[in-house]
């Protein structure tokens, strides 16, 4: 008999995470690697765990993630968003908890484009009075 799986897609900056929740003992596998090995920073590992901690389901599901694009921060945010959406499909009663924690909102902040005549998005070339 096939296990019940819950899917969720998360996005952050230029990262996209496709998340599957399967009932298990709480392992998190990202792109075929354990998430302790994949994400080198403890703070970002906590970001990934936030939805599971908020809904008190930390040891109930195995999380299988396929993520691409962006860097560590973007990928961690995308995974968090994807896990939140998948948990919502698993149990709609988590909506209020996840919403209050701000985990269902897509973080719309993106890198600002470089403008012509400037060195970066806002950095102007050095000004010389004389």
Swiss-Prot record:
Gene3D superfamilies: 3.30.230.10. This is Small ribosomal subunit protein uS9. InterPro entries: Ribosomal_Su5_D2-typ_SF, Ribosomal_uS9, Ribosomal_uS9_bac/plastid, Ribosomal_uS9_CS, Ribsml_uS5_D2-typ_fold_subgr. GO terms for biological process: translation. NCBIfam families: PRK00132.1. GO terms for molecular function: RNA binding; structural constituent of ribosome. Belongs to the universal ribosomal protein uS9 family.
